[in-house]
Amino acid sequence: MRRRAFLRGVGAAAGTATAAALGGRASTRRVAAHPGPYEPYGSIDVAGAKEAVVGPDGDVAYLATTTGYATVDVSVPDRPELLADVRDPLADRDGGPLRVIFDAKLDVADPTTLVVAGPANPRRGAISGILVVDVSDPARPVEVAFHATDFPVHNCFVRDGLAYLTGNDGGRNPIVILDVETGAEVGRWSVADVADAWAAVPSGLRSVHDVYVADDTAFVALWDAGTWLLDVSDPAEPTLRGRVDVPDPEPLAELPESAVRRRATLPPGNHHYVATDESGTLLGVGRESWGRRVADDATETPAANVAANDSGASGPAAPLSAAPDAEFVGGPSGIDLWDVSDPAAPVPLSTVPAPATPDPTYGGVWTTAHNFELSGGVLYSSWYRGGVKRHDVSDPAAPTEASWWRDPDAASFWTARLAAPGEREGFFVASSMGVGDGPAGLYAFPDHAGEQADPSGVLPSGTATPRPRYGTGTAGGSDATTRPGADGGISAPGFGVAAGAGGVALAAWRLLRRAEE
């Protein structure tokens, strides 16, 4: 039974009052449902939208909104409605409010508990930690606790009353496990504890960007240090269970800082987001990367460019074109699928490539992989201005694209999350941080195959050449170059390990710290 009537009955007045008191930032647009061309069912503007998750009944979406958090009723997907829009939480505390909020997660085992994390990046003098919110009535969220940390919290995962936090401190960069009720630290793990060779790698190359927990296994995305699988059956003592696409640490340890900066945005590496399907045996690894113009490649990555990476701002609307004779190093990466049924011996299955882009540089048109969900044999994925996609991954060795929607002039998608499965009435939601001065918000899309009737012609057709994983590139010390082809896509052979020695997340934070000092 859909809950729209219930939500209206118990919380519509509160939701309206909250929205009005906090700026009335939401406005709804309607579109026609299927049959017909593939397009959104509906969307709603929510300022600052970043990560989104959906409750288990598929009726409510919960958003991190940069300056707060919000709940949206999506039970009628062509008419999403704002329930609550909370801005500047903890404003009454020293160092408050909690800011730069990019992540919010429901407890998988107790979806009445929402954890709001921040700041995503260091802010001098600002509070940092997790805000625990009771969302048993999503129209009337109640803040029940705040647990402070001595590190920024870029991302988190919550399961069984435990919050798994990205503990980037510029040193060991651990995963930190907290008790959601008490705030007590339960355990922690760092790749620097695995071997001295990893401790010698610059922290910017082994920043912990995200974490996902399935049953008693935590999957930790460590940027250029690959993805690590931990046994957390005893969360007080996480132990190593396996590793995915992990390079030799010694070449990374030998890179000078100038090389780290130069390669901060380039593949391979760049493990950004990880998630499994319901079985816990099919793992998706999203790799976030960009390219560099060959003409600029001899120069160091500008500090301002790197520091902007995790700002979360939509930024200016980069021109949707590049010089026709431009050559590039690197490019956007996709989502790798792995069989992890034996965690000690993961098997690569396939790569879902990124949409093609006319300009793969950091200042260009982003189409690299961002957050996603694997559910019911379908991969729901977001690609910034490259749009959202659905792939049939019932045979994960041969993914098939089933639908793709994009509007690169208006939407830059942060995540895609299943709300209700099924071709007839199913749908998924996707949050967009907007483009330029355009609004951010939440979209609802049909959960069926289809083709967009009139996609914007500014993006090339097809996909970018899949970026190599570690150990899959060609031998030799030179980087391959790419040139937009006839269809505007990026084509390039793979490169070796040295081409991907970046660590954009923590490199950005280090530069931000320097700028603030």
Label each residue range with its predicted role.
Residues 1-517:
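Hydrophobic alpha-helical segments
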